[in-house]
Amino acid sequence: MKLKALLKTLSIATAISLAGTNAATAAADRDYILATASTGGTYYPVGVALATLSKVKLEPKHKFSLSAISSAGSGENVKLLGENEAQFAILQGLYGAWAWNGEGKLKQAGAQKELRSVSMLWQNVEHFVILSDMAKTGTVDDLKSMKDKKFSIGKKNSGTEGSGRQIMSGLGVDPDTFNLAYLGYGASADALQNGTIDGMNIPAGVPVSAVTRAYASMGDKIRILNFTDEQMKEANGGYNLWTRFVIDANTYPGQTEAVNTIAQPNFLAARSDLNEEDVYLLTKTIYENLAFLNGIHKATKAMSLQKAIDGLPVPLHPGAARYYKEQGIEIPAHLIAD
C-alpha cells in the first residue's frame, strides 16, 4: 500500500510538473519576437511602438505580446523569420519581393514561401532629384540622358542602392553608365549643393530633411522627377510593389508644383504558421489604436486603413486578411494566400 501510495503521489507530482512546463512553454511561445533594424533608424522605434501597443492592449486580456529586437535590417530579418528566430519583422517592400521570389540579393537563400504580410506601415517615397537644366521632360526619362553625369545612388549595398538599381533597370537605365557616388542622404544633399554631383536618389518618408535642405539652398535649380503611369509599371518590373504617391506642391521650399512619383512600402511581415487569431487581434488592435502609435513615433502617422495593403509584396496572413475583409477592403488575388 505504501508503494502504491508513493507511486500515485509521484505520478500526480509528475503530471503537475509537466503541466506547468507545458503551460510555461505555451506562454513563452506567445511572446513573439519582432525583428527591426539598427537602433538609429526608423524600423527600431516603430517596432518598439508596436511591441508597446501589444503589451498594453493585448497581453492583459489575450496573453500574447511582441518584443522588439534590433537587427541588421531587412536582409537579416528575412533570415530570422525563415529560421523562426523571429516571428514578426519589419521589411522593406523590395526585400519582401526578393525573399518571396528568391531573387535579387536574396537569390542564394531561395524562395521564402513561409513569408506573409500583415500591414503596410509607412512608405519610402522615391525622390529622383536632378539639376533643373537636365530635366528636359521632367520625368524619369531624363535619367536616360545622364550618362557620365555624377549621381549619388546611396551607400554601397544599402536599400537605397538596391531600390534605385531595381527601378532604373525597369526603366531601361543602366546606373553604371553614370559617374556614381555612394553617399548617404545628408552627404548627397551637401554634394548636390556644392556641385559635386548632378543628381541623387533618396527614398524616404515625406518630407525628407535632406531634400528640404537641398531645396532651401537651391530652389528651382533642382527638380524631383515625375513618373508616368507607364513608367511606374516599368519600374515595378512585375512586382506590384511601387504605387502612386503625390508629393503636394510646397512640400519643399520652392517646389511650386505637385510631383507624381512612386512609393514602396515598409511593411510588417510574419511567418505563415502563426496563430490566425493572434495575427487577427494584432491587426485589429493596430488599426483601432493608431493615435496611440502616432504618439510614440511620427512615422506611424502615415498609416491608415485605406493604405493598409498598398504595395504589399507577399500574400496576407489569413488573420490579417480576415480583419481587412471585415472592414470592407477588397483583397486582390495576388495577396490571397494558398
Identify the meaning behind each predicted range.
Residues 108-127, 251-259:
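A structural signal for short loop-to-beta-strand junctions that line the ligand-binding cleft
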Residues 31-60, 68, 124-194, 306, ...:
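Bilobed "Venus flytrap"/periplasmic-binding protein-like clamshell domains
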Residues 216, 222-281, 323, 327, ...:
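C-terminal lobe and pocket-closing loops
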Residues 16-25:
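C-terminal segment of classical bacterial N-terminal signal peptides
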Residues 187, 204-219, 224, 274-338:
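An extracytoplasmic/periplasmic, membrane-proximal ligand-sensing/linker region
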Residues 56, 67-109, 186-191, 206-215, ...:
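Pocket-flanking alpha-helical
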Residues 82-90, 149-151, 194-202, 218-222:
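Alpha-to-beta junction loops
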Residues 1-11:
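Bacterial N-terminal signal peptides that target proteins for export
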